[in-house]
From Swiss-Prot:
Protein name: Lysosomal-associated transmembrane protein 5
Primary location class: membrane
Provenance organism: Homo sapiens
Expression by tissue: Preferentially expressed in adult hematopoietic tissues. High levels in lymphoid and myeloid tissues. Highly expressed in peripheral blood leukocytes, thymus, spleen and lung, followed by placenta, liver and kidney.
Family, as annotated: Belongs to the LAPTM4/LAPTM5 transporter family.
Modified residues (Phosphotyrosine): Y259
Function: May have a special functional role during embryogenesis and in adult hematopoietic cells.
Record GO biological process: cellular response to leukemia inhibitory factor; defense response to tumor cell; Golgi to lysosome transport; induction of programmed cell death; intracellular protein transport; intrinsic apoptotic signaling pathway; negative regulation of activated T cell proliferation; negative regulation of autophagic cell death
Keyword Protein biosynthesis: no
Induction trigger: By retinoic acid.
Lineage, highest ranks first: Eukaryota, Metazoa, Chordata, Craniata, Vertebrata
Amino acid sequence: MDPRLSTVRQTCCCFNVRIATTALAIYHVIMSVLLFIEHSVEVAHGKASCKLSQMGYLRIADLISSFLLITMLFIISLSLLIGVVKNREKYLLPFLSLQIMDYLLCLLTLLGSYIELPAYLKLASRSRASSSKFPLMTLQLLDFCLSILTLCSSYMEVPTYLNFKSMNHMNYLPSQEDMPHNQFIKMMIIFSIAFITVLIFKVYMFKCVWRCYRLIKCMNSVEEKRNSKMLQKVVLPSYEEALSLPSKTPEGGPAPPPYSEV
């Protein structure tokens, strides 16, 4: 084994990076196809968000961009699968870039889930300012930090295929509507823990793909170096081909002795 290959780890937390990356690529390809089918069925059945008669230019642009994005997700996932199978490290770069963007959007989604908390803290700071163990300045500072998070969450106005609240069909995003304060806080804590767990898993999968990229790149560089050092092999001509070749006897020189059987 080449010493450079030994420096690249082929496992990540007891999992082979090539197997994990291949499984991830197959999963993304299947999910892209299912997402395209689901979106097409919604448009065909004329859901409220997809009726052409009720949408303007913005809704039409949003619908077209949704299909374009799903198609790009499928192409990038297929590129990842081809890159792993055929050892083309460059085909892994689009997926790595997509994962970075997806991770940033997930962070903004997590920050956007705290958009309703500043109002609770303001109410608590006004009603419990005298009996609270925390100083009012601390509560105001925390409220200011959460307001900054709210400002960051304003950049979540992305198309509907990436809008977290528009995809909240199962109501797994905590909301303060018809929910007591204590229950809402508990739901936010559970939601944050679960979402952070998902982010950690995304980082782990990104690490697997990155190590697979380095491994394939190192393997290709070793193979190219090995091929460059190989000597060119020349195949000798047969007897008939040698007789048909022009004579290399210099002009005026002695002719070679005739061939004779012993």
